[in-house]
Every structure is written in structure tokens, then in C-alpha cells.
Amino acid sequence: MEQKCKIGGEGLRNRGLVNEEDRISELPEALLLLILSSLPTETVIATSVLSKQWKSLWKLVPNLKFDSKYHYHYTFSDNVFRSLISHKAPVLDSLHLKVEDKDDALDVGILIGIAFSRHMRKFVLKITLLEESFVRFPSAWCSCNDTLEILELKYCILLDFPSLVCLKSLRKLYLYHVRFNDEESVCNLLCGCPSLEDLVVHRHSTTDVESYTIAVPSLQRLTIYDDYYGEGVGGYVINAPSLKYLNIDGFNGLEFCLIEKAPELVEAKISAVFEIANENIMDSLTSAKCLSLHLAPFKIKYPTGKIFYQLLSLELRAYSYEWWNLLWFMLDSSPKLQILKLVDPYQFPKEDCSVGWEWSRPKCVPECLLFHLETFVWTRYEWQREDEKAVATYILKNARCLKKATLSTKPIGSEELEKLGKRREMLNELATQASPSNSCNLVFESE
């Protein structure tokens, strides 16, 4: 059974945990505070019995962490309240509250109010209730705040912002499976953060808000994970002109996903996105220099022409027998591509594939192969498949500037000598296919 540290328990000295030769107290106070900041506040408070010097030292610790499961029933709120009132540090750098009891959650609003009055810089609130009821976040404390820089909210929290918030210094906002009261609350929160740079959103339902609008001019990093498979209801509207990093994962069966172009975009990762009625995802990524795509080919719209003029690095994780089509589309659309990575792109047995699944040789060699591609990596290369062998051969033959190619295959046991021999024969044959115009370093690996 888990041993829990309870406030008001047996003293450390009485349990023989205090050495008569107290060397740790000789450390500089700044170092002691740094050490104590990494511990749960319940443990930090327990150190007050060590000596006269330690009696008030915990009150200066800038980072406080409380977990309701380490408190006796009905004592959590009182203990947190007393700790916040007794806190003497000039600034409260961070406060972590983890609440697992419905009764303790009732006083969260009061505790948050005290913390905000202490000029808090980082606040993490995690509420997990068995009844799956939601605790309303006190919006009044967000009406005018110029010290909070990081806000992280998790699970059973209801966000209701009837008017525009004013979080002038907020730079990072993390929302994990929280609920909004309405679409207006989303806009009032995000539009009231003029310094917001990093936004992370995890959702598994569109029942609270159908149109999730993210319009933040200052936003530089955006991550959205939505594992809800919808029925063509709801979606996202994203307008972030300063965006440099975009990560979208799990947009399945949404009604729409509309993204304004981000001219400063550097890197984007798009995974498990398909069957969206109205979307422009790929068209919004044309400024990216680095792309990672994990998609079922052509389940979303692909614009035509050489549109990825800035793209230098492409990682492709397709999971359909049609993935060749996506590969050639991206190569043909990215004339300056220098790095190509293929990762486990084939997960379907040949007998399950429809007619016409075989790879067909492109009519024209993509420009990036002729003039720019320098690095080619293929992870979990299926050397026994003729189609994959044909693709690898084509790239090696036509990539005139290729400097290094790495192909990794699944391991083969030493008892399968015949299979090992066939793989060695195939790899040796492949090694002869590299374009004679380059000095490519061809590497074969086994995972």
C-alpha cells in the first residue's frame, strides 16, 4: 500500500531521521530553497521541525505543490489556505494543485484567488473527479492580471468567460480535456492574452464547443490533439499569422478545419487527419521548411503545382497501400527538398490491397531529386516487397546530389540463414543502383 505523507504526522526527529551532525543546514539559503522547491509542499513543511533555522525556511520556497491524496479528508483546503497565507516569498513562482475529491474541489476558487494575489507566475490545476462533474474556474481573477506567465488546466474544469479576460503576461497556455461553456468563452480567453506564444489543446469531444476559434496574432507554437471521431459536426478556425510551429493530431470526421496561411511557419506535423468536409490544411503549410506527415493518402485536399518552395525536410509516415501517390506528390511539389525520411510507410499485406496498388514510375524525375536531395532515410524498409525495392532504386538512381542514404530493416534471426542470404543479396544489388554522378554513402542497418 502506498505510504502517504500526512501533515501533522510524526516528526522527522522522533523517527530518527535527523543526524546529530547537521551538515545540510550549513548550505547557503538560496541552495536550500532550490532543493526544497523540487519537493511536494507537504514534505517541505515537515522540515520545519528540523531546527530553528528550518522552522520558517519553508515559507520562503517560491514553488508550492499540493496533492489532495496526501491529506486527510476535509483537511486539504485548510492546509493549502494556511500555507498560502503564511507564504513570505516576494513572488510565488509556481503553484501546483492536484485535486481528486469533490469536497476539496469546492474551495478551489478561494485558493486560486489567494494565489493570484501573491503575484503568481505559473499555475497548474489538475482536477480529476470520479463523478466526471466539472468545477467552474473563477473567471474574475483573469479580468486583470499582469504577472501570470504560464497557465495549465487539466480535466474536470469548466471555463466560462462571459467577457474578455486580461492576462497581459501569459505566454504559455495548456488546456487538457477541459470544457468551455460556449464558443464566446473560447474567444474571450484567447483574445485576452496579447503575449500568448505557446498554446496546447487536448480534446476528445466537440459537444461543448462546435466552432473552436483560435485567433491570436502573437501565437508562435500551436499543438492540437483531438481524438474524437466525429460525424461531420464542428471543427476549428485558426488565424495565427506569427505561427512558427504547428502540430495537429487526430482530426477525424470534423465538419471543417480552416487555417489562415502562416508566412513565418517553420515546422509542421500533421497526423491522423482525414474525412473533413471543409478544410485547407495542406494549403496552409506552404511556408514550412520542415514537414512531418502521417496521413492516409488523399483523405484530405492536396493543392496542385510546386507549392512547397521553402520545404527542406520531409518525414512521411503514410499508412495505406496508396502511399506512393502521396510520396510522389510531395516530391514533385517540393523542388528544394534536401532531406527525405520514410518511416514504416506500409502496414497492409499485399493480398488486402485493391487492384492497381502497384507503384508506377513517374513520367518526369522530380526537381528535388535532380538538384537538391542530399539525405535519404528509410526506416523499417520492407526489402522483400518489389514495390518498395523499385521506389528505393528509383530514388538512388535519380538523386544526383545524394550524400548519404540509410535503410534500416527488421531484424532476422541467425537461424534463418536463407533469409539472411537473400537480404544480403538484395542490399548488395541495391548498392549498385546509386547514381554514378554522386559519392553517396549507403548505409544498411538492422533495428
Curated annotation (Swiss-Prot):
PROSITE patterns: FBOX
Cellular-component GO terms for this entry: nucleus
Membrane-traversing stretches: none
InterPro entries: F-box-like_dom_sf, F-box_dom, FBD, FBL13/AtMIF1-like, LRR_dom_sf, LRR_FXL15/At3g58940/PEG3-like
Cystine crosslinks: none
Domain FBD: 358-409
Name of the protein: FBD-associated F-box protein At3g49020
